[in-house]
Amino acid sequence: MLKQQLYDANHDTDLKLERVKAKELCHQYNQLSPADEQGQQKILYQLLGKMGANCCITAPFWCDYGYNIELGENFYSNHNLVILDCGKVTFGDNVFVAPDCGFHTAGHPIDYERRNQGLEYAYPITVGDNVWIGAGVQVMPGVNIGSNVVIGGGSVVVKDIPSNSVAVGNPCKVIRPITEDDKKTYWDR
């Protein structure tokens, strides 16, 4: 999977067992009381590859393997986060993810014969520091999102987004840079 080559996720016994283990941990996590922060942290430490301090994932949360996910410091996600981590998914520090977002490293061949064999590929996703991902955003395989970025709600991110930018749309495109004026609050303008 991590070699960015075609692999068989449907018939590989080890991968199937690893996905079941991750789904079990996600299920346990999603059943916890929202007040059980200690229980949440315990499961996330079992599930994720790396987790910085002050991380919060609001249930429900689902992933494929978990061990390919790395969270930086002060990561926060709202409800319904899905991370298909067949490839590495790395989040920097101070990343906020709004509800109903997905990070999808897995893809399938366009050629139906290979696709029907159960073959798929995975490309890593990287999100830099100080990033806000709006509600309903979907990030596709191989995307790199720079630091100090805002991705507008409902966007489908299919190409890299440079640092210090606001990007939105389907497909997601940079609409403007982030400037010093953005440090002013809306009521100061």
Regions found by a protein language model. Give the residues of each.
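Flexible, glycine/small-residue-enriched loop-and-beta-strand segment within the central core
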Residues: 61-71, 76-145, 170-189
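Conserved catalytic segment of ABC-fold P-loop ATPases
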Residues: 146-149, 162-164
